[in-house]
Amino acid sequence: MDEKFWEKICSLQENGEFEKIIKEIKKLPEDKLDMKLINVLSRAYINLEDFENALNTNLSFIGKAKEDVTNADIWLFSECGWICNEVRDFEQGLKYLLEAEKLGRDDEWLNTEIGQCLGKLDRVEEGLERLKKSLKLIEVEDTENIYKKIFIYSEIGYLYELLENSEEALKYFYIAKDLGRNDNWLHMHLWINLEKTIGKEEALKYFQNEIKTNDVNSSLWRSLGQIYMDVFANYEEAEKAFKNAFKYSLNGQYLYDRSRALMGLKKYKEAIEVLLESRKISEQEEELTDAEDIELAHCYIALKDRKNAEKYLEFVKEGIDNIHEEYIDEYKSTLAELENLINKL
């Protein structure tokens, strides 16, 4: 392809015009296609979340590269494996990844992907072998890549958790923490395994001590709030923790969490104020507001305010088109529950 063609493609990529990229490449004769074009076409589909066409694009070019067919096919099988994993078809994803391995690929990325697949397929011991191999490979290939190390240590910890080996799980989670991971996922998995090894009260003390030494850590405050709320039903302490989480990071999720604690305390008017603030942030960030709308409807139902309950019920109904197919039945059930409660007012 000439320089003018690639300038146009680059411009379309920068502007996020992926449908136009697809049209431009689809105009080309089949004998003009090469690995670069196939990769651009596949990525355009991926950016549009059209994973089926992305997969078919890669599969269609296997064995057709004009140069270095083996390495081209390794890349294509690897991409196919990754795409299948993205749509949670781990069995098929594993098959493609193993094809890439048969052709000679044996690096950290491939072993990590295979390890994840095996874990998702309940072949946990095999998954651990692959991920531990990844740790060895990364020390050779990319020893300074802390983010990859954090990910692999976290995955190993998670697989040990699946095996109910909390001591080993904690060992790897602590390493991920020491390397710099600081998020709700890690904190809650630490909680799960600490609870199993030392009990709820001692596990709670661990988090209380952590927050004493790092009291501006919004993620840690949120995790502590979840523990107070979901494990101990201590809504008062949970509300304080979520309030601190928002204080140190203006994340609307923390407001939503705080509203749930306030609802647990039956402080519905305060919960409404917090939910409206959370909803405003969601709108500003162009995110869905269905979670806030559902809880706002619940609050107004509790206050026997039918007019406002119906107002937010309508927002909940409008939001159904944005719900992923995987969660649609649960969403419809929530909608029916709200309608039933409002009809009883």
Pin down the residues of each PLM region.
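Start-of-helix register in tetratricopeptide repeats
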Residues: 3, 36, 71, 75, ...
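TPR-repeat structural position
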Residues: 18, 51, 90, 124, ...
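Residue-level recognition of tetratricopeptide repeat
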Residues: 10, 43, 82, 116, ...
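"A position-specific structural signal for the A-helix of alpha-solenoid helical repeats
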Residues: 7, 40, 79, 113, ...
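Register position in tetratricopeptide repeats
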Residues: 14, 47, 86, 120, ...
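Flexible helix-coil transition and linker loops at the boundaries of alpha-helical arrays
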Residues: 26-32, 62-73, 102, 136-149, ...
